Amino acid sequence: MAAHRFSSLLSRSVPLLSRGGKQSYLGRGVYRYGTAAAAALEEPIKPPVSVQYDKLLINGQFVDAASGKTFPTLDPRSGEVIAHVAEGDAEDINRAVAAARKAFDEGPWPKMPAYERQKIMLRFADLVEKHNDEVAALEAWDSGKPYEQCAQVEIPMFVRLFRYYAGWADKIHGLTIPADGPHHVQTLHEPIGVAGQIIPWNFPLVMFGWKVGPALACGNSVVLKTAEQTPLSALLVSKLFHEAGLPEGVLNIVSGFGPTAGAALCRHMDVDKLAFTGSTETGKIVLELSAKSNLKPVTLELGGKSPFIVCEDADVDKAVELAHFALFFNQGQCCCAGSRTFVHEKVYDEFVEKAKARALKRTVGDPFKAGMEQGPQVDADQFEKILKYIRSGAESGATLETGGDRLGTKGYYIQPTVFSDVKDDMLIAKDEIFGPVQTILKFKELDEVIRRANNSSYGLAAGVFTQNLDTANTMMRALRAGTVWINCFDTFDAAIPFGGYKMSGIGREKGEYSLKNYLQVKAVVTALKNPAWL
């Protein structure tokens, strides 16, 4: 489809996972699941996939780390080891950057006709689509997110991203600019060179697409550092990229840890560009390391504490469902999650009761079990951090409506949790929890909620639920956020730019805007002798 939208997948498919007693059309069949609180946790289901690639990808070859070290990637359902993956460090980053530099300076990729790059990217997208179920299963196993979500939402998103950026490959061009005097002035849009990219664990492949797609479309080479929690899916799809004809050295993947591999990539003098998605604290370090090395430009997509505002004229049932999705999707592990739910005082009590009931109906269990809306959190650190915030909320005076504890005794499952009577100065209303914890705050006036919504160091996204066009128009302009969703949430498209205000980041990813991250603009001025019409 010419205008296939991510939002159509999210708005049609994901909400079906969030209606108790309804049918889910995610997965290969049609499944029915009940309205009991949370699914009983059983022994983990054997994943329908095996780990084939656990080494570093450097110069087109899968290789061991120079140190010979490996680290375990764990199954969030049990805490057990899935595989031991090569642990890259500074020496491996040096090898990967050298390969990327040679591929850029001497290889065919930046010099080949743009439509040839386009063909390779399209072949890659076709191969991932062909292997959709295998890639989705590996993603679900390593991250803990529901397989159905991966298979029917995230992998199709990934494919769409590469088809979108393939379409841009042969449409990048400069301008001819009229200037004073007898001169011909033009601009050249040139690939920036070697791009260093660091992706997070919450959407490993989607973030791969956001970063690698535009970089390659512009003719750059890439060194990608994966998150240590979720290294497997990137290695699998990189194999498919080389099957599609990607030249050696154009894409290099190093699995490892931030203080060793990540820091080495950020400070490397032969890296021309950095892109990072992760926490605000780490983003500051990335920016500092760039500044202290070669001042390479940096794109940052960082934390968020996004408001979801339910106005007094809202259809409460629809607002409850959308607010539930805005917060709980992906186990609450979304940088743009609607994690501050502001509800008008006239509908507050009704909203709280229905939000509690909806959370109680949320199905939580093994990601490979049909109909699961929520799997485990990604790892023990994230699990413990979320439980600590839940305790903080209860201790600070918020009302715990439901949830508030771990689910089962094995793995990193947390009960869907809802707090009411939340105040702006509570930690659960200020900090990015990154988990299944909904905080519901009351407001009275429009100006008041705008002020409170903007009173945050973050500015990644916001949501507004209203039937009043004037209210919507006021909100979309007043809210200090990179994305404002009106009567929807988490509506994504490859063409829609994404990024934050304030401490939520620098720059934009996705869409035409993202291409600018990976291009240098060169002005060329040529003196003219006796021009015919100047």
Swiss-Prot record:
Assembly description: Homotetramer.
A Pfam family annotated for this UniProt entry: Aldedh
Glycosyltransferase recorded as keyword: no
Transit peptide: 1-29
Tissue and organ distribution: Expressed predominantly in the upper and lower flower petal lobes, and, at low levels, in flower tubes, pistils, stamens and sepals.
Purpose: Component of the floral volatile benzenoid/phenylpropanoid (FVBP) biosynthetic pathway. Catalyzes the oxidation of benzaldehyde to benzoic acid (BA). Capable of oxidizing a broad spectrum of aliphatic aldehydes; increased carbon chain length results in a decrease in its efficiency.
Induction comment: Circadian-regulation with peak levels occurring from the late afternoon hours until early morning and lowest levels during the afternoon in flowers.
Catalytic residues (UniProt): E301 (proton acceptor), C335 (nucleophile)
GO biological processes: circadian rhythm; green leaf volatile biosynthetic process
Domain of life: Eukaryota
Keyword Mitochondrion attached: yes
GO MF annotation, one: benzaldehyde dehydrogenase (NAD+) activity
UniProt name for this protein: Benzaldehyde dehydrogenase, mitochondrial
UniProt cross-references to CDD domains, sorted A to Z: ALDH_F2BC
UniProtKB keywords: Mitochondrion, NAD, Oxidoreductase, Transit peptide
Major subcellular location class: mitochondrion
SUPFAM superfamilies with a match to the protein in the record: ALDH-like
pH-dependence of activity, as noted: Optimum pH is 8. Active in a broad range of pH varying from 6 to 9.
One cellular component term from this protein's GO annotations in UniProt: mitochondrion
Regulation: Inhibited by disulfiram.
Enzyme Commission number: 1.2.1.28, 1.2.1.39, 1.2.1.3
Cellular compartment(s): Mitochondrion
Family (UniProt): Belongs to the aldehyde dehydrogenase family.
